[in-house]
Amino acid sequence: DIVVLEDNPYRELRFSGTATDSFGKELGEQCCMLGTFSKIVAPGMRIGWVCVRNKALREKLLSYKATADLHTNIFSQLVLAQYLADNDIDAHIEKTKVLYKHKAELMMDCMRKYLPEGVEFTPTEGGMFLWAKLPNGMSAVDLYRVALTKGVAICPGDPFYEKARNVSTFRINYSNSSDEVIEKGIRLLGEACEELLAK
């Protein structure tokens, strides 16, 4: 028996394109679905959820969870429960998707405008990040260092690969920045890319 672990923390934040079905619909007891409130309610609210139909698997997960950290922060759970009782979470998610779509489109427009030729990015249909790629042979860790001197933070792709180091991919977040900060940040990131390309 194989259990499929479906980890889709950005599922609710898809703002364009075609929504994807959960594996859980097809796989039933063979699927374990994970989700989080940190992406849809508040980043500091490090509370997630697990949906498992298989009773034996659920019992094992509960046992592992209990030994991993004894228990999840009770106060945070109570605050979240009260928030969910007092607010329409679906309306909140819809509002967030509209905001994130605007920010993502602005960031992509700025990337087209300010990033030098050879730097590519993957258009997004949801979530809170954009992925970009430097020309082959260039390290996103090097870009991170140059960009940081300009006050711009990116996340090099290295932690997202099992063994690769000094990869050319990097991730940038648009969820918590104003329009002005997004434009200024991407302009400065473009300058950092130019400096790196000139070396």
Label the model's feature ranges.
Residues D1-K199:
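PLP-dependent class I/II
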